[in-house]
Structure formats: structure tokens, C-alpha cells
Regions:
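Bacterial N-terminal signal peptides
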Residues: 8-18
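Short beta-strand-centered segments that line the small-molecule binding cleft or hinge
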Residues: 116
């Protein structure tokens, strides 16, 4: 009996150990809060992968820069410290000019235009990341960008001297062009930076404004709808290749669904975010004709600069986009 019992226990152990060893666990850091629609979409993506693989691939989402800060995420995925990660394309424009294409003011100002720009640029962007051992899974836009300011702004002249949050090379360049002071502040630090007076203005979406409770310290939002920057979820190519074919298929299928869902949610929530800002006492308004014209001139100058930096490849992407 003892021999039989030992055999049963040993078999049970082997079965349990085998199941455990067959399970793969991945970490996915993101810089945004758990309540943000991007993060919620990523959590849904992870759940779909878990279900499709029968629990063999578990993806742990680390929100609000709890595992890596925004500027660290891409390198962490490249180095295998995290298997996946979410990054903002425009944050890496200094590394690769093409990454800044959706941060050029007024190049694409609606969801329809943003989708055309993504279709025109996707293959090139994917190829650039592939050279770094990274694979694009899905990319989702933020709502259109507008100007938050403690100061009333009727023209670019009113922006001189503002302490301007810069989250990307493009937003830093805007600050320089309008005579503001660019200050690098990550999304997770915005609330504190506004409360302490480290910054008094920024250009970002209604979503970020709502998430960071900008309305507690800032009263003006000018809905310039200047551009729709995208986040992208990337995976370490070696980690992806280590999966069996069925798991790879599950990841890609869930990623395609997440991209479709993310674009729909982003567009659907755009108006809702602005309504929440209004309900919390903010003045949400269209830019004055003068401010709009001034910002368009800045956009034209920045597009010319970007085309010089990105060379023939950048021009080809913009030309393809404009023909769509």
C-alpha cells in the first residue's frame, strides 16, 4: 500500500509540476493609471490571452509606472527585464525621427486622419523596431491634444513665459517656439507638478487632464485638436519566439482585438472627458481664431523640421498619408 501511495503522490507531484512549468508569466509595464482607458484595454488584452491559452500564458499588467517609469519601458523590454511594455511613440523621437510622426501638430487632427496616418506609417515603424529586437502588437491613440493653462490664452503671445510640461521632443519644441519654459514631467507626476507650481500649462488630451485631476489647479482648456499621439504595446521578439505557435496566435489575435477596441473607446470617450472637465469647473473652449492661426503656423514649421530630420522615408510616409 505504501508503495502504491508513494506512486500516486509522485504522479500527482509530476502532474502539478508539469502544469506549473508549462505556464509562462510575462510582465507588462505601463506609465498610466489603472483607471485610464489605455490600461483598461491592456488588462482586457491580458485576460483574452489568458483565456485563449488556457492559462498557459499569464500577463501581469503593472500600471502607473509602478515597475518602470515611462522613459525606461522600451529599454526594459529590449533588455528582457519585461517581456512586453506600453510606450508613447513620440517620447522616442530623439532616438528615431519616424517615431515622432503622430506628434507633428495639425498633420492628423481627427480619428479618421489618425488612422490613415497609422496605416501609412505602420510598416516603416514596425521595421524600425524589428531592428531592435522588438515587435509591435497594437497601437491606440489618445484623444486630440489641447492646451491647459492657468492663464487665459487668446494668442501665442499670451503663452510667453509659461512653465510648460514637455512630455516629448515635440512638446518641448512647441514651448521653445511660443516662448514658454519646457519642463520634463511624466504623466504620473503631473498632478503634483501642477499643485506645487512646477508647471502651469501643458498640451495634452482630455483623458490625461481628467486622469490627473487638472481641474483642481487649472481652469482653462483650449480644444485645439492639434494631434492624436499613439501608445504602442511592444513585445520582446525573443520572448515571443519562445512561445509555441498556438500561444503566438492567441497573442496576435488578442492584440488585433485590442487595437480595434482601443481606437473605438478612445473616440467614444473623447467627448466624455471634456464633459467631466466642464463638470469639475473648467472652462473648455475652442481656441480663438488668432490662437488657432498662430498654432497652425507652428505646426507648419514643425512639419518642415520633422521632414528634414526624417529624410526620404518620412516624406514617403507623409506623401502616402496625404494620398489616402
Amino acid at each position: 500500500m505504501k508503495t502504491q501511495s508513494h506512486a500516486i503522490v509522485t504522479l500527482a507531484f509530476l502532474l502539478t509540476f508539469g502544469a506549473a512549468s508549462a505556464q509562462t508569466k510575462w510582465d507588462l509595464p505601463t506609465a498610466y493609471p489603472a483607471s485610464n482607458f489605455h490600461t483598461e484595454n491592456i488588462v482586457a488584452f491580458a485576460a483574452e490571452v489568458d483565456k485563449a491559452t488556457g492559462g498557459k500564458l499569464k500577463i501581469q499588467v503593472h500600471a502607473n509606472a509602478s515597475l518602470f517609469k515611462a522613459p525606461e519601458i522600451k529599454r526594459a523590454v529590449q533588455g528582457g527585464q519585461a517581456q512586453l511594455g506600453e510606450m508613447l511613440w513620440v517620447n522616442y523621437e530623439n532616438e528615431d525621427a519616424l517615431f515622432g510622426i503622430d506628434g507633428v501638430p495639425f498633420l492628423a487632427t481627427s480619428y479618421g486622419e489618425a488612422m490613415k496616418l497609422w496605416r501609412a506609417s505602420r510598416k516603416s515603424l514596425e521595421a524600425h523596431l524589428e531592428k531592435q529586437g522588438l515587435r509591435v502588437l497594437f497601437s491606440v491613440p489618445w484623444p486630440p491634444q489641447g492646451i491647459y493653462s492657468k492663464r487665459t490664452i487668446n494668442s501665442v503671445a499670451d503663452m510667453k513665459g509659461l512653465k510648460w510640461r514637455a512630455y516629448s521632443p515635440a512638446t518641448a519644441r512647441i514651448a521653445e517656439l511660443v516662448g514658454a519654459q519646457p519642463i520634463t514631467i511624466q504623466a504620473a507626476e503631473v498632478t503634483q507638478a501642477l499643485a506645487t507650481g512646477a508647471i502651469d500649462s501643458m498640451m495634452t488630451s482630455g483623458a490625461t487632464g481628467y486622469d490627473t485631476k487638472v481641474y483642481e489647479t487649472v481652469k482653462n482648456f483650449y480644444d485645439t485638436q492639434a494631434w492624436l499621439p499613439k501608445n504602442v504595446v511592444i513585445v520582446n521578439q525573443k520572448a515571443f519566439d519562445a512561445l509555441d505557435k498556438s500561444a503566438q496566435s492567441a497573442v496576435l489575435k488578442a492584440a488585433a482585438a485590442a487595437e480595434t477596441r482601443g481606437w473605438t473607446t478612445s473616440e467614444e470617450k473623447t467627448g466624455w472627458y471634456l464633459d467631466q472637465l466642464r463638470k469639475n469647473g473648467m472652462n473648455v473652449a475652442a481656441p480663438s481664431p488668432t490662437l488657432k492661426a498662430d498654432m497652425r503656423k507652428i505646426g507648419d514649421a514643425m512639419l518642415a523640421d520633422w521632414l528634414k530630420k526624417s529624410g526620404g522615408e518620412g516624406k514617403a510616409v507623409v506623401d502616402a498619408y496625404r494620398k489616402m
